Regions:
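Glycine- and acidic-residue-biased ligand/ion/polar-headgroup-sensing regions
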Residues: 50-52, 56-62, 67-68
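Residues that act as N-cap/strand-start positions at coil-to-secondary-structure junctions
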Residues: 20-21, 48, 81-83
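Ligand-binding loop in jelly-roll beta-barrel domains
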Residues: 83-111
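Short acidic-glycine-tyrosine-enriched beta hairpin
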Residues: 68-83
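Conserved short histidine dyad/triad with adjacent acidic residue
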Residues: 33-49
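Structural motif
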Residues: 33, 42, 61-63, 70, ...
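A cytosolic small-molecule/anion-sensing beta-strand core signal
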Residues: 30, 58-59, 74-75
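A short, N-terminal "cap"/entry segment at the start of jelly-roll beta-barrel domains
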Residues: 1-35, 114-116
């Protein structure tokens, strides 16, 4: 028997987020998840040795810092960070909200910041 399906309002889910950092699974697809994240301060430098990570901006501006590059991701913009790439994210203003597409059992390895 087929499961009952209903569309999800991502905008309403975004309004439910209020903490400094929240990262909530919205959906599962095979061995991947779609998460919605709200952040008000920078996340630590890290990498994922086993999975790419795709970000889709929903609200505000998400700053993606790589070793030699800084990218600003606005609502509706998307980027994929290849596995093994050291990076960190932070909001450009008071907060940012984004969707993240990644393996459900993604490994996160904390790293030192890149040398200046």
């Amino acid at each position: 028997m087929r499961a009952f399906m209903e569309p999800m309002d991502v905008g309403l889910k975004a309004q439910e987020l209020s903490g400094k950092y929240e990262n909530v699974v919205l959906s599962r697809t095979n061995d991947h998840v779609v998460r919605i994240s709200r952040m008000t301060e920078p996340y630590f430098w890290h990498l994922h040795p086993d999975s790419d990570e795709t970000f889709l901006g929903v609200e505000g501006v998400l700053i993606l810092e790589l070793e030699h590059q800084r990218i600003e991701l606005g609502p509706g913009q998307m980027i994929t960070v290849p596995k093994g790439t050291r990076h960190r994210t932070s909001p450009a203003g008071s907060h940012s909200i984004n969707l993240t597409f990644e393996r459900a059992e993604i490994e996160t390895v904390r790293t030192d910041p890149p040398a200046l």
